[in-house]
From Swiss-Prot:
Residue numbers of Phosphothreonine PTMs: 211
4-hydroxyproline modified-residue sites: 234
Glycyl lysine isopeptide (Lys-Gly) (interchain with G-Cter in SUMO2) cross-link site: 256, 268
Record-given protein name: Cyclic AMP-dependent transcription factor ATF-4
Compartments where located: Nucleus; Nucleus speckle; Cytoplasm; Cell membrane
Source organism of the structure: Rattus norvegicus
Length: 347
């Protein structure tokens, strides 16, 4: 009896923890684990569950879950019929069981999409060979020991929790009665930003939709895997051709700094002005020297002519003086001759 109750509690714990376990997904895996539990049950000693114990059980509050056997002489499968029946999980008090008094209400759509997100990011982790990104624990205050009770849970029963008032006003009323192997399709309009608390890579997906990407798969990669894959790196795929180093120039050599263009232009202008000024000064010097030489030559010529004329004038003066002397001498001579004739006439 103790072994079967332990098996019952273990299966029920697996049922409750399977929505948060990524390894317990899929109907075929659940059925295979169910067969394993049945094989284990064969080795146990057959015991029957009385209807009184089944009615007073805190875990199973249903009268038809266990078939009563008073004799205890049936086979090993007589007490495992309850495993094939459907159970109504609404009767269980999960808040008291898992100590979730302060846990906020979770939307029903997030519980349904949790399995899809696990299947979506599982192949990405295997391809990139990176550590899986740390996801936020949707059960805020659950201890780690309770979460890792059973890594291979056989069933995936989901209990619809009451939604928040703001979420109920914007989404239609869905009555979830999920069975084994059922699929849930949720439109994009029903998905609210609340899913960012459970999926840490939603902001990266939104950024990838804004910028054009090379792949049309629509899967957003994690930052670790994004850095790991060279074909999706933004530095190599969107780098401008100017930023790539030329093959002729080595990477270590840097271009030498040149003078600013303004300084070189002003220096050229200054040198040109200085050259023009020097040329003009030289031209003025040559012109002045030529002018002085010309004036000097003219002056020398004038002085030479003046000297010659002065010499002629002096010569003429001397000649005039000599003539004047001769005239005076002749006058004196004529006067003496008159006087002498006059004396001769007067006796």
């Amino acid at each position: 009896m103790t072994e079967m109750s332990f098996l019952n509690s273990e299966v029920l714990a697996g049922d409750l923890m399977s929505p948060f376990d990524q390894s317990g997904l899929g109907a075929e895996e659940s059925l295979g684990l169910l067969d394993d539990y049945l094989e284990v049950a064969k080795h146990f000693k057959p015991h029957g569950f009385s209807s009184d114990k089944a009615g007073s059980s805190e875990w199973l509050a249903m009268d038809g879950l266990v078939s009563a056997s008073d004799t205890g002489k049936e086979d090993a499968f007589s007490g495992t019929d309850w495993m094939l029946e459907k159970m109504d999980l609404k009767e269980f008090d999960f808040d008291a069981l898992f100590r979730m008094d302060d846990l906020e209400t979770m939307p029903d759509e997030l519980l349904a999409t949790l399995d899809d997100t696990c299947d979506l990011f599982a192949p990405l982790v295997q391809e990139t060979n990176k550590e899986p990104p740390q996801t936020v624990n949707p059960i805020g205050h659950l201890p780690e020991s309770v979460i890792k009770v059973d890594q291979a849970a056989p069933f995936t029963f989901l209990q619809p929790l009451p939604c928040s008032p703001g979420f109920l006003s914007s989404t239609p009323d869905h009555s979830f009665s999920l069975e084994l192997g059922s699929e849930v399709d949720i439109s994009e309009g029903d998905r609210k930003p609340d899913s960012a608390a459970y999926i840490t890579l939603t902001p990266q997906c939104v950024k990838e939709e804004d910028t054009p990407s090379d792949s049309d798969s629509g899967i957003c990669m994690s930052p670790e895997s994004y850095l790991g894959s060279p074909q999706h790196s933004p530095s190599t795929s969107r780098a401008p051709p100017d930023s790539l180093p030329s093959p002729g120039v080595p990477r270590g050599s840097r271009p030498k700094p040149y003078d600013p263009p303004g300084v070189s232009v002003t220096a050229k202008v200054k040198t040109e002005k200085l050259d023009k000024k020097l040329k003009k000064m030289e031209q003025n010097k040559t012109a002045a020297t030529r002018y002085r030489q010309k004036k000097r030559a003219e002056q020398e010529a004038l002085t030479g002519e003046c000297k010659e004329l002065e010499k002629k004038n002096e010569a003429l003066k001397e000649k005039a003086d000599s003539l004047a002397k001769e005239i005076q001498y002749l006058k004196d001579l004529i006067e003496e001759v008159r006087k002498a004739r006059g004396k001769k006439r007067v006796p």
